[in-house]
Amino acid sequence: MAKAYVLITEDVKDPDGMAEYGKVASQTMASATLLAFDQKAEVIEGTWHGTQTVLLEFESEEAAKAWYYSDEYQAAAKLRQAAADCNGVILHGLG
């Protein structure tokens, strides 16, 4: 089964709100591996949205979706969405 990745870009408007999000969201991420958290991503082509980028790895697309759509994470996501303008995608690994 191919791994899946969640990539989220965030243009942070409320740092305190994002800090609260981080506390709540971290409690939901047992099934994820944090691969990257970058506040200074180097744009090598085109334009990039956001002041920080997060890349999470999951064992499968199903695991990524189960985490993202869970009641626990959706409660946390509301905090993130209130504190930042965000974009997110699920990427499908090879394999």
Segments from the language model and where they lie:
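Short S/T/G/P-rich N-terminal loop/turn motif that feeds into the first structured element of a domain
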Residues: 1-52, 59-69, 92-95
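C-terminal structural segments of small proteins and small subunits
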Residues: 61-89
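Generic beta-strand structural signal
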Residues: 52-54, 86-87
